[in-house]
Amino acid sequence: MRIGIGYGAYCRGDDYEEGFKKMKSHGYDCVDYGHINNKNSELYKLSSEAFRAYFEKVRESAEKHGIEVWQMHSIWPTVNSDKTETDRQKTTEFFIRQIEAAYYLGCKKFVLHPFLPFGNDVEGDYSFTFQVNVDLLKKLIPHAEKWDVTLCVENLPFRNNPISKVSEVKRLVRTINHPRVKVCLDTGHANIFSSDIASDVRLLGDDLAALHVHDNTGWCDAHKLPYCGKLKWCELLTALGEIGFRGCFNLETAISNDMPEPYREEMRTSLAKLTRSMAEQIK
């Protein structure tokens, strides 16, 4: 099985050449590309030709070093960004541009977060929240088909939000019932709601298409390294094997760039080895 890690764990902004090289040397196969999840990014101001050229260059660099852009991380929800129809339409336009970028990167999995029309951690109106997300996905499906991308809806860490739990994301995806719409399981987010991560995996089954792997104590979205929180890793790996998951075991955690050398290099290498050993247990 492939193993991967987030772009920011090794790369900074447009400085990715050395990052991809190190990523591969430490043992990773894939990257979760996140250098486009800021609405204020200068990349969105590029012409169509320059936009395409930029991401094709990133892809060429990754491929040169043996790294596949397995999945892409979309815009993270922000307070008051999805409250009005105008706000949601603007965000949808960003999603559409990102899906196009995914194609140029050779990326097949586009991870997106549900709309939060009442705020990040506010219950609001369940039916309305659910419906605006159904509408969002239906708008994005034609673009996913055009650019050969699968939309992977991510579960969230907000306790009071109606579409945060794995079960609710599953319901959303089943309501759409389209082969281009699947789920990205964020293990840390799921652990905030339940310690039974294996049941979440089994519930998702064939709808599981991507992973964000990290740990926490069940209290907050801490993005700890595996085995540094309370997530039941053995049960998770067993369940992934049971459902036949054969995608990328992708970390959404990293060794801090502030860690002094040579310890940073040693810890990065060790983390990659640990990740590989975990992926090998998924049978």
Residue ranges and their predicted role:
Residues A9-C11, H35-N37, I75-T78, P114-F118, ...:
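Active-site-proximal loop/turn and secondary-structure-junction residues that shape catalytic pockets
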Residues K39-Y44, T78-K83, F118-G124, I192-F193, ...:
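A short acidic, helix-capping loop that chelates divalent metal ions and anchors anionic groups
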Residues Y44-E49, E85-R88, Y126-F128, H223-C228:
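Short glycine-enriched, charge-decorated loop/helix-capping segments at active-site entrances
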